[in-house]
Amino acid sequence: MKQVVYVASPDSQQIHVWQLGSTGELTLLQTVEVPGQVQPMTINPNQRHLYVGVRPDFGIVSYNIADDGTLTAAGMAPLPGSPTHIGTDLQGRFLFSASYSFNCVSISPIDEHGVVQTPIQQLNDLPAPHSANIDPTNQILLVPCLKEDKVRLFDLSAEGKLTPHAQSDVTVAAGAGPRHMAFHPNQQVAYCVNELNSSVDVYQISNNGQEYKIIQTLDAMPADFTDTCWAADIHITPNGRHLYISDRTASLLGIFSVSEDGREIALVGHHQTEAQPRGFNIDHNGQFLISSGQKSDHIEVYRIDQISGELTTLKRYPVGKGPMWVSILAPRA
């Protein structure tokens, strides 16, 4: 089966389902009407369920993924706050939801049918948590809290309970505003994009995954950029050679090369993209990048140069209104 791309458009309450061809072309498979403004999405590690966060009736809609990638609704569960970012643990047993405006993170069990259930825990008084990211050991949840300039760390128990990690947090530069994260495939390095100054922090992971330390910070914007920074998303290629971020003010993608050990990044350049790129993603083969324009109502596909990481525009496609999230299903054997 070919890869399948899901694009969430909250303003029209739709998910567009596309098949991704081997040369980067997209073929529309399905348009799903969602019961609410669909925002964050995540795919179960077993690749058979898609989860989407909706508002104004805060909740998670679970979808079954058919063999061709199309979706069928399987259930809905409530959330304590408006979902800003969602993710699962690596075994697909629990779903985490970060709520920026409600200052909380919740954890919900996923049943044996792949359907998200009512939350079993809620962590409150987190200053504007913008994402919830499980680490490569499946034991630590990292939560960038934008308004306190810290990334909080929590231990995840086998029963799905979160408690503060021994290293409770990592402090970033004042006013940076940590937002989204990505992990290097070697599992020894993590990256966090900072919304308010459009920089990237590189984290060294040590002590068997137990300790995090910032070892590099790099500006992602052009040297002559003088407007307000407004970074959004971050992703790394599967081979760990190139890292990308999006900035919504400039409507561009920042391109970084990554050292072999992942510990050092270098700014390669920029590529203009769709207006206000809230979300983008990279296919599982590392060949294509797909960016969504929250203000353009389009997505655009780019080919990734395997040596330089630079992008070549292939084609843009109309989607729903206000697209802001892109998830990509891995090809099934």
UniProtKB/Swiss-Prot annotation:
Which keywords has UniProt assigned to this entry?
A: Carbohydrate metabolism, Glucose metabolism, Hydrolase
Q: Which GO terms describe its cellular component?
A: cytosol
Q: Which GO terms describe its biological process?
A: glucose metabolic process; pentose-phosphate shunt, oxidative branch
Q: What is its EC number?
A: 3.1.1.31
InterPro entries from the UniProt entry: 6-phosphogluconolactonase_YbhE, Cycloisomerase_2, Lactonase_7-beta_prop, N2O_reductase_N, WD40/YVTN_repeat-like_dom_sf
Q: Which major enzyme category is it?
A: hydrolase
A Gene Ontology molecular function term of the record: 6-phosphogluconolactonase activity
Any Pfam family hit = Lactonase
List the catalytic activities from the record. 6-phospho-D-glucono-1,5-lactone + H2O = 6-phospho-D-gluconate + H(+)
On the tree of life, the source organism's domain of life is Bacteria
Which pathway does the record list? Carbohydrate degradation; pentose phosphate pathway; D-ribulose 5-phosphate from D-glucose 6-phosphate (oxidative stage): step 2/3
What is this protein's function per UniProt? Catalyzes the hydrolysis of 6-phosphogluconolactone to 6-phosphogluconate.
Q: Tell me its family.
A: Belongs to the cycloisomerase 2 family.
Tell me the protein's name: 6-phosphogluconolactonase
